[in-house]
Amino acid sequence: MDVLTSAADFKKSKVPQLQELDDLLRCHICKDFLKNPVLTPCGHTFCSLCIRGYLSNEPKCPLCLHELRESMLRSEYLVNEITETYKAARQRLLDELNSLETNQDNSVIEVVSDKEPSLLQIDDDVNENSNHITVNDTSDIIDEDNEIQITGTKRTARTILNGSRPTKAAKISDMFTTRKAKTEEKAPCPICSQLFPIRYLERTHLDECLTKPPTSSPPIKQSRLSPKPSESVSHVKRYLNSTNTSTQQRLPKLNFAKMTTSQLKQKLASLSLPVSGTRANMVARYNYYEMLWNSNFIDSINPVSESELRRQLMSWDASHNGNNNSSNGGTNTISQLMKMNSKNKGKEYEKLLKDFKKDSFDKKGWMLLHKNSFNRLLCDAKKTRRKTENETLMTSQSPRESSTQTELSAT
């Protein structure tokens, strides 16, 4: 299941301005990050699929209510790459900010002394010749959550010797040290190529590694320790090389009032779309596929294949037209396949049902869930094939038998 994110995640971070950046990169309609963003003539940006679905109900901009049509939309490849880059770095950025706050909260002040010393503070307001110092009472020291809070009344003491002031100031500075968690740097051993702390490597490990007998396993090569080059997509290169080179044409809107049901089925069949359900189901199916098609091949910088579009349509069809399809008497509809084995495998079925409506559909899990049904279909197909082959063989042998019988009777 996808993790829900919100711009408010950065509200209490060290950089609260990132909340506005996170919010600006989200679609006003779906509240999620922009996907295949398009620009309107009035200067607003939405997801391509979101605004197309909105315009099918009301031909106005959702923000300023200016007149808007689908033909006015323009792709924004730059905003798409900015959004994808931010999405890839968002979680790491949030983790770094949270870890920074945690390290600052857990900083500890350690008092280095065998005995409980008096806490001294030099009073700069007094005359230099008076040699006054201020002593803080240590009876009111409160330790809460790894933090030391020092309170108390100030008492003034006169020193006897003039030279004692710098000595006491030096002692005061040595009484407090800040202890921070530091991770010791590591380096690979030039002999066994394993990582060790640098201090341990220089003082101890090198001598031990040189004197110990060689093992049967060959040493690890240095190239294995070097980080592999990143396989992530370069959004800068993709934007600079971006151009709409798709050979697919825009899918037109149809005038269903002038089309018969048979013509509508022919149109769906030409696009390899299911023709089950009522006429209203088929109209809704084509309208949604038209939005998917144009959003993908017209507005996307990285369009997916037609088979993926049909899978998304099947997911949408299962959640919107499922009841109507089953009432139509269909036996192989997606909605009925999703309901198979739901009683016996409830949790697994529910998880697949949720994932089926998203891009992260588990095909292997689906095959395992319906493995028995697939095997049954295979057995039925094999039986039908054998039966057909036997019938063909029998029909081919019958003319031969009749011809031999006529020859015998003639003799």
Curated annotation (Swiss-Prot):
A zinc finger (UBZ4-type) spans 186-214. A zinc finger (RING-type) spans 27-65. PROSITE patterns: SAP (PS50800), ZF_RING_1 (PS00518), ZF_RING_2 (PS50089), ZF_UBZ4 (PS51908). Residues 209-234, 385-411 are annotated as: Disordered. Its main location: nucleus. It is found in: Nucleus. Interacts with E2 UBC2, forming a complex with ubiquitin ligase activity. Belongs to the RAD18 family. This is Postreplication repair E3 ubiquitin-protein ligase RAD18. It comes from Candida glabrata (strain ATCC 2001 / BCRC 20586 / JCM 3761 / NBRC 0622 / NRRL Y-65 / CBS 138) (Yeast).
